[in-house]
């Protein structure tokens, strides 16, 4: 109950909760559409999905300011790669939210003469750039942590006097096993990095589908959005699990 109250008291938390509901409806609708006798349920899910999506617009109006603040914070990062990636990513997020606000204004009749399709594609393009740059930052962090895990393991093996248990061998299978083990240990050591990587990877399926770069069905987009929303909710409930800039 305390966790729910904490989420409900934050605009970002409410947005993530609504987003999880929206994508859960999308996923359920995909699973039920092919089943006979479920037409009424599918219609209700579609209506709920539309209502939740409309409700989210009110929370997202303030996200432009939040994205600007995030851009200012990312400029102060000490590591060059995260600073560059996060600054460019957040600038694209600012433009995305501006496009989203224009689309919202068009949908409620506050403005006219707006080409909806053009603005939707513009928003999807900047959302894609934001997520792509965020994933580049995640990859950089993963590689740094993998290097640290490899160095720590080498020190332990050297101090114990035991022969190395894993090495980059000539055989491809052994190399792959060593790489996957390093990756697993790196993400296990750093839950915030794991959550951020999962969230961004699942989210990028949405603009990839919208831009036609990689077409997915409704079920894949709904599942990806749901997983991403749950990961985002976890960071709202437990702020210590949010990935910090170096």
UniProtKB/Swiss-Prot annotation:
Record-annotated membrane-spanning stretches: 94-114, 218-238
GO BP annotations, alphabetical order: brown fat cell differentiation; peroxisome fission; peroxisome membrane biogenesis; peroxisome organization; regulation of peroxisome size; signal transduction
InterPro entries reported in the protein's UniProt record: PEX11
Molecular function per GO: protein homodimerization activity
Its membrane topology: Multi-pass membrane protein
Chief site of localization: membrane
Protein name: Peroxisomal membrane protein 11A
Organism: Rattus norvegicus (Rat)
Lineage, opening ranks: Eukaryota, Metazoa, Chordata, Craniata, Vertebrata
